[in-house]
Amino acid sequence: MKRPRVFVTREVFPEALELLSKYYDVEVWDKYQPPPYETLLSKAREADALYTLLTDRIDCDLLSQAPRLRIVAQMAVGFDNIDVECATRLGIYVTNTPGVLTEATAEFTWALILAAARRVVEADHFVRWGEWWRLRTGWHPMMMLGVELRGKTLGILGMGRIGSRVAEIGKAFGMRIIYHSRSRKREIEKELGAEYRSLEDLLRESDILSIHLPLTDETRHLIGESELKLMKKTAILVNTGRGAIVDTGALVKALREGWIAAAALDVFEEEPLNPNHPLTAFKNVVLAPHAASATRETRLRMAMMAAENLVAFAQGKVPPNLVNREVVKVRQPGF
């Protein structure tokens, strides 16, 4: 029996490829940049399975032109780059890698919070680029003043796995925790003393606003001009969720006009971020290249989970992290 063919859209950990090779003929796109759409389309036409990343556009046009394709295994929690509804209609399974990046993303969120609150990147540049040397100030009582976190209010927008872990760390810093989410989290309220707020009140009260929402039609540009104007002038906005949750133009205006004090961003509406983008001009903005999950431990777990989803499918089993559960009614798993 001919083995199914999987196209892996980027170099991943060899352990994952080794596992895949036991069940699939594996082809890997070995360039650092993602495959161009036309290349991806060409590969999909010949593939039984795709191993994808958020940077790959898996739209209905591509799915419709891939007659052999049975499963798309995404190495990410999010899957807004995939037309899941179309995939389900065509009997194509879609999987993701939930849960494994909670710790890494929460830790990185706190790295951003601390960097923005204590002006760490500014301080590094101040020393590295010679400004401290030129000023000959030594220690100065008014130099690089930031803000303490103890006693401040941490607002969590999206109290899922990551948001709740960020809140837990915030509690250890002695912060007051408030949150807005689709549903009340009674257990977290009890454990952390967290208080539920409407979105408007969350924005008004937060000293640090940390965003942990998936991107949907409802959350796209959820934070725009009117929302940013509700925030404190001393507030810091942190986004490790999805870039398009925040209207970038509105955020630039808010920073330029002083509606908020600072921002720390790991995700953007357009990635990679153009080095000439207005956001890069602000000293009070910390920028990172969508790196919140970038620890060796987490990325290996993600790579293996995506591979394990593909292996389960090849064995005729429903993959453990199936996104579109209703697809089972359209087609049974396996090749």
Swiss-Prot record:
Organism: Aeropyrum pernix (strain ATCC 700893 / DSM 11879 / JCM 9820 / NBRC 100138 / K1)
Catalytic residues of the enzyme: 242, 271, 290
UniProt-recorded name of the protein: Glyoxylate reductase
Keyword Cytoplasm set for record: yes
Catalysed reaction equations from the record: glycolate + NAD(+) = glyoxylate + NADH + H(+)
Subcellular localization, as worded in the UniProt entry: Cytoplasm
GO CC field: cytosol
Binding of NADP(+), residues: 159-162, 181-183, 240-242, 290-292
Assembly and binders: Homodimer.
Family: Belongs to the D-isomer specific 2-hydroxyacid dehydrogenase family. GyaR subfamily.
Top EC class of this enzyme: oxidoreductase
Lineage per the UniProt record: Archaea, Thermoproteota, Thermoprotei, Desulfurococcales, Desulfurococcaceae
Pfam families reported for this sequence: 2-Hacid_dh, 2-Hacid_dh_C
Gene3D superfamilies: NAD(P)-binding Rossmann-like Domain (3.40.50.720)
Keywords for this protein: Cytoplasm, NAD, Oxidoreductase
Keyword Manganese: no
PROSITE patterns: D_2_HYDROXYACID_DH_1 (PS00065), D_2_HYDROXYACID_DH_2 (PS00670), D_2_HYDROXYACID_DH_3 (PS00671)
Domain of life: Archaea
Alphabetized InterPro entries for the sequence: D-isomer_2-hydroxyacid_DH, D-isomer_2_OHA_DH_cat_dom, D-isomer_DH_CS, D-isomer_DH_CS1, D-isomer_DH_NAD-bd, Glyoxylate_reductase_GyaR, NAD(P)-bd_dom_sf
Principal location: cytoplasm
Signal peptide, first to last residue: none
MF terms (GO), sorted A to Z: glyoxylate reductase (NADH) activity; glyoxylate reductase (NADPH) activity; hydroxypyruvate reductase [NAD(P)H] activity; NAD binding
